[in-house]
A protein has these predicted regions:
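Membrane-interface helix-loop-helix modules in multi-pass inner-membrane proteins
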Residues: 64-134, 151, 452-456
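Aromatic-rich transmembrane-lumenal/periplasmic boundary elements in polytopic membrane proteins
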Residues: 149, 231-334, 338
Length: 542
């Protein structure tokens, strides 16, 4: 039997595994393009330091990639175990991009990862660079297809409900592929991943510079990360704004929740910078507002209003009543004897209200027999169409605030790199090191807003979350949740241990004999050339 507790614990399990997985994904997306840049410099200049940079940062990339794949594979099985009705209902549509991702993108990136690590002595410089570029394309193609699937959940286009099969069926693959929400989500997410990768390299390079070790290696890494990070965070912010506009078109409820906008304001709407939200009374006790900004972000105009939560609830209530009729008509169509011709009048009536079927299914949470749903139940279902406002409001602002802090960091880092004086600014290096967790936190906040703000839907406007779960015992879900948390925590600890281990060793982990910590080689070189160990290190790196 489906219960509220079963739905909540199933949601929690998927949320936990997804958030764990997304600790690894953005670093993979970002670091792979930094490897392309570094190896391109090696091919163009022939300087060994660029090859060493590619190999060292590639070692950290490889650790992260392996654990990211491990956490990602197990997520897919949850669709069959915990979300069986979801899989049956939308599998024809949702499964297509995931299948393409596995057959095309994942195999490409996995093959190229192997060639990247084991091909240094077997491939020419140009061939190995091509492998690295294909590896980068593979990781980004993988993200593209997964985000096309997720974008369809947010804005389900190119598919229709078939009452004869009781499932969604794809009608226009191009519409699914070029779904504006999916495309905006893709470019915004990968840009955020690039920012994560740049921050990672910037922070570790800053640590080397603070320790005054591997200086020439760290200087180059810092400069590459500063330039790449500045472009990435600018792209993330601009594309995040575009994603906000897309939300305003397809998910007005989410937009209103993000802004704690209870009433429809005259256009152009103001942006609530901060607010004291009173969820119980459905109002803001006070708010600090910036005039016009929300209207420009949400509508790209000064004369189009943004609907407030109260008006959205009025619209949703009408759709629930329409959906109730759709559910009853669907029951009539399903009750027809097998092989008989459906009543054309019933079919025509159903087609008129089919678009609101999902809203009618919301009532099943409160009344298994939708025909017996009372006005009080309809009101409950209407209230449930609005996600909790407080976590949405503050998570979005945390994401944006961290984004602008990163913009400030990369702007100053890039300017100092151009001037060549960032080594003389220990405050900047310490700041870069302290900001290491920031892009991960921003990315996790962003995913929380995207997924939590879609509630109460798995497929927005079509399939309620309550209606999507498997009919399994709560004890089974608790057991698998505990297993996943334990397993993923161990993987995270392994990742952190290996990352810290090799980051502390630095490029000396390559065993080239040229870097800090390889004392035998430095003493030998310095004595033979009559140089200090530090001078010998710099000369060999360059």
């Amino acid at each position: 039997m489906i219960t509220e507790h079963l739905v909540d614990i199933s949601r929690l399990q998927f949320a936990v595994t997804a958030l764990y997985h997304f600790l690894f994904v953005p670093l993979t997306l970002g670091m792979v393009w930094l490897l392309v840049i570094m190896e391109s410099m090696y091919v163009m200049t022939g300087k060994e330091v660029w090859k060493d940079m590619t190999r060292f940062w590639g070692k950290l990339f490889g650790i992260n990639f392996a654990l990211g794949v491990t956490t990602g594979i197990t997520m897919e099985f949850q669709f069959g175990t915990n979300w069986a009705y979801y899989s049956q209902y939308v599998g024809d549509v949702f499964g297509a991009p995931l299948a393409i991702e596995g057959l095309m993108a994942f195999f490409l990136e996995s093959t190229m990862v192997g060639l990247f690590f084991f091909g240094w002595d077997r491939l020419s410089r140009g061939q190995h660079l091509l492998v690295t570029i294909l590896m980068a394309l593979g990781t980004n193609l993988s993200a593209l297809w997964i985000l096309i699937a997720n974008g369809w959940m947010q804005n389900p286009v190119g598919a229709e409900f078939n009452y004869q099969t009781m499932r969604m069926e794809m009608t226009d693959f191009a519409a699914v592929l070029f779904n504006p929400d999916a495309q905006n989500k893709f470019v915004h997410t990968v840009s955020a991943g690039y920012t994560v990768g740049a921050t990672f390299v910037l922070a570790i390079s800053a640590w080397y510079l603070l320790k005054k070790r591997d200086v020439e290696f760290a200087k180059r890494s810092f400069q590459v990360a500063a330039a790449f990070g500045f472009a990435s965070i600018c792209s993330t912010i601009v594309l995040g704004d575009e994603s906000g506009y897309s939300i305003g078109l397809a998910q007005q409820t989410k937009m209103a929740a993000i802004e704690a906008m209870w009433e429809t304001e005259p256009a152009p709407a103001s942006f609530n910078l901060i607010a004291d939200i009173n969820q119980a009374e459905q109002k803001n006790n006070w708010a600090v507002q910036i005039p016009y900004v929300m209207g420009l972000i949400g509508t790209r105009s000064l004369d189009t209003p943004i609907l407030g939560i109260h008006d959205i609830k009025i619209i949703n209530e009408k759709r629930i009543i329409n959906g109730q009729k759709a559910v009853l008509l669907l029951d009539q169509l399903r009750s027809a004897p097998p092989g008989s011709t459906p009543n054309p009048v019933t079919v025509a009536e159903f087609e008129k209200v089919k678009k609101d079927l999902g809203f009618g299914l919301l009532l099943k949470r409160y009344s298994p027999d939708v025909s017996k749903a009372t006005p009080a139940m309809i009101k409950q279902a209407t209230d449930a169409t609005i996600p909790p406002i407080v976590p949405m409001f503050w998570s979005f602002r945390a994401m944006v605030g961290l984004g602008f802090l990163l913009l400030a960091l990369f702007t100053i880092s890039l300017w100092s790199s151009v001037k060549g004086n960032f080594i003389e600014k220990p405050w900047l290096l310490r700041w870069a090191l302290l900001m290491l967790p920031a892009p991960w936190l921003a990315a996790e906040f962003g995913w929380f807003v995207a997924e939590y703000g879609r509630q109460p839907w798995t497929i927005y406007g079509m399939l309620p979350t309550y209606f999507s779960t498997s009919n399994i015992s709560v004890a089974n879900v608790y057991a698998s949740l505990a297993g996943f948390v334990g397993f993923y925590t161990v993987l995270l600890m392994i990742e952190m241990y290996l990352m810290v281990k090799y980051a502390r060793k630095g490029p000396a982990s390559l065993g080239t004999g040229k870097y800090y910590g390889e004392d035998t080689h430095k003493v030998h070189v310095s004595s033979s050339l009559n140089l200090s160990p530090k001078t010998a290190e710099v000369n060999h790196v360059v």
